[in-house]
Regions:
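Glycine-rich anion/phosphate-binding loops
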Residues: 1
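Catalytic alpha/beta core domains of metabolic enzymes, predominantly
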Residues: 7-14, 21-123
Length: 123
């Protein structure tokens, strides 16, 4: 398995994230594949998922009994993915307007879904 060869070429404690961006890649990473990789490679600790599919995102979050780290790559779905339990977002836009993303994240962590969605809609 390619992923195992890459993971084993790194130090055992070196954390590796998969990157799922099916609309741009020929090699889609399904939740089943991510689960197999996570099982075979202890240092593969999570995934950045850059597609607006909440069902898949939630399936990724179930890997390793919920300990597999999942980050969104979709700016327009940040509040929704954070509310669903994603670990955060990897966002180019956040480099330019970090206050917006911090406000959404803080609202989610405070349990204020209404405010997080309002902040998210203010793009």
């Amino acid at each position: 398995m390619y992923y195992k060869a890459v993971a084993e070429s790194m130090p055992a404690d070196y954390p590796i994230y998969l990157y799922g961006i099916p609309q741009c890649a020929v090699n889609d990473i399904s939740p089943a594949l991510a689960a197999r990789v996570a099982e075979a490679c202890p240092n593969v600790i999570g995934l950045k998922y850059s597609f607006n599919d909440m069902i898949r995102l939630q399936k990724f979050m179930e890997i390793r009994e919920g300990t597999f780290s999942v980050f969104s790559g979709c700016d327009d779905m940040f509040a929704m993915t954070a509310l669903a339990g994603a670990d955060g977002i990897v966002s180019g836009n956040a480099q330019a307007i970090p206050e917006h993303y911090v406000a959404v994240w803080e609202a989610v962590k405070a349990g204020d879904a209404k405010k997080s969605n309002a902040d998210s809609a203010s793009d």
